[in-house]
Design a protein with these regions (language model features):
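Class I SAM-dependent methyltransferase Rossmann-like catalytic core
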Residues: 1-34
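Class I SAM-dependent methyltransferase SAM/SAH-binding core
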Residues: 34-88
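Hydrophobic beta-strand segment of the Class I
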Residues: 98-99
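A short glycine-rich, Lys/Arg-flanked "PGG" loop and its adjoining helix->strand segment in the class I
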Residues: 111-126
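Conserved class I S-adenosyl-L-methionine
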Residues: 126-155
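Short alpha-helix
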Residues: 147-171, 175, 207
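Conserved catalytic loop of SAM-dependent methyltransferase domains
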Residues: 169-194, 202-204
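C-terminal lobe and adjacent flexible extensions of AdoMet/dcAdoMet transferase-like proteins
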Residues: 193-234
């Protein structure tokens, strides 16, 4: 499956796509139960997961990368914009929460994208990545939207976040439902999740990781500024 907006819209209209949305959304809300008064950005194809924030957050924006294309969402008052990974069209530190779904794995330069997300995230803000698990069936099957681009082991995600001045704070997994499930199996999604979390935790379809700005990343510009001042006085 190509990671473009049209294919993803079609996937989330299927029985297995709707089940996947429910399973992932459930874990997302456990990690982020409250967004009242916050400014929320969804990056990638995050719109299936942003609806709960519309009635709570101060502001919700869905940014879709140029190579993916864009769809109008929600109906009647579109909040979607198109942007480039290397230059997100926002000022610094404007979002309190950033949700990334179908975004990191397809990025041309994942580190550059994460540095841009760091730039637009508020100092006390949080980013939540939903990324395909390299060990899962969802990352192996061609018809799966989580098989596009680069899948990740947990350690790879951890290293990538730390390299881009994020500090991982919470980890979770979701999506034990097989990607080839028909309507009948898709209805049993909650049962698949319970069994998978208990007996096969490493085979979840996606990793979920919440991260904040690292103290090193926040302190570094100040240290550089002091060093430059000292050199200027010398």
């Amino acid at each position: 499956m190509q990671l473009d907006a049209g294919n993803l819209v079609d996937f989330y209209e299927t029985a297995v796509g709707q089940a996947a949305r429910r399973m992932i959304s459930h874990r997302l809300r456990l990690l982020w139960p409250e967004s009242r008064g916050l400014r929320v950005l969804g990056y990638g194809f995050a719109i299936p997961y942003l609806k709960p924030f519309l009635g709570e957050a101060e502001r919700v924006v869905a940014l879709m990368p140029a190579q993916m294309g864009v769809v109008a969402w929600p109906a009647g008052r579109p909040l979607t914009v198109l942007g480039e990974d290397a230059a997100l069209p926002f000022a610094e530190a404007v979002f309190d929460r950033i949700l990334v779904v179908h975004g990191l794995e397809g990025a041309d330069a994942a580190r550059l994208l994460l540095r841009q997300l760091w730039r637009v995230l508020a100092p006390e803000g949080r980013v939540l990545l939903v990324a395909p698990n390299r060990a899962s069936l969802w990352a192996q099957m061609e018809a799966s939207p989580f098989a596009c681009g680069r899948p990740f082991h947990k350690g790879e995600l951890d290293a990538l976040l730390r390299d881009t001045l994020f500090e991982p704070l919470q980890w979770d997994r979701a999506l034990y439902l097989p990607p080839f499930s028909g309507r009948r199996l898709a209805r049993m999604g909650a049962g698949w999740e319970r069994l998978g979390r208990r007996f096969l935790p490493g085979l979840a379809g996606v990793h979920l990781v919440e991260a904040g700005k690292s103290l090193y990343g926040l302190a570094k510009p100040q240290k550089l500024k002091r060093a430059e001042s000292a050199l200027a006085r010398a």
